[in-house]
């Protein structure tokens, strides 16, 4: 019997990460759930996924720390011996005006949102190439290409993530590893609750999205599912914007 493929989704205890992990499990992947603080939510997600008949590994790791990344991938190798899909979803950030930002705010955000992709991708590639390749998909946001209030650290980190996606796509292609990103418009998740202007963002999305509705978690996950399929093999180094057309109206 063919061994189940394995997918790692960072920051997968809730929101888009949780939904992506569940979708991949529905497609038969064994799942690695990663969390930094939400242990209870991570275990609940694992229990939900196990009911789908696949194996689950839960790993606590702050992906902003390369040493923790190495430990996480060592656990993946020991448990599953392979990795086929890596969804780089974990994100954090300090939401303040430019003049109020401190070095610690910058470093925290860049480490988790940008540096993590590089060092996770290095470790993921080592496992993926043993089984003929794989897919890496990162989650970005529109703040990478347009101004959002108090979003400086996150926006810059997501711009770095998208640039790194292009470099990884070229350099990992010889290993048959396909790298892309998905950038979403405003989605009503737990993460958005940290925004002081949350209601303004949601109302803007409701009123000014050409598609006539807000982007939902399912829309993001549908795109991730497509990008890790063979149907998307000729899409490389791209950031697919899933915003219902909102970014077209400036």
From Swiss-Prot:
Alphabetized UniProt keyword annotations? Fatty acid biosynthesis, Fatty acid metabolism, Lipid biosynthesis, Lipid metabolism, NADP, Oxidoreductase
Phenotype upon knockout? Cells lacking this gene exhibit a 250-fold decrease in the triclosan MIC.
Q: In which pathway does it act?
A: Lipid metabolism; fatty acid biosynthesis
Top-level taxonomic group: Bacteria
The catalytic residues are 151 (proton acceptor), 158 (proton acceptor)
Kindly summarize what the UniProt induction comment says about this protein's expression.
Answer: Expressed during exponential growth.
Tell me which Gene Ontology terms the entry assigns under biological process: fatty acid elongation
Q: What is its EC number?
A: 1.3.1.104
Instruction: Fetch the SUPFAM superfamilies from UniProt.
Output: NAD(P)-binding Rossmann-fold domains (SSF51735)
Q: How is its activity regulated?
A: Inhibited by triclosan.
Q: Which family does it belong to?
A: Belongs to the short-chain dehydrogenases/reductases (SDR) family.
Q: What does this protein do?
A: Catalyzes the reduction of a carbon-carbon double bond in an enoyl moiety that is covalently linked to an acyl carrier protein (ACP). It confers resistance to triclosan.
| Protein's name according to its UniProt entry | Enoyl-[acyl-carrier-protein] reductase [NADPH] FabL
- Which source organism? Bacillus subtilis (strain 168)
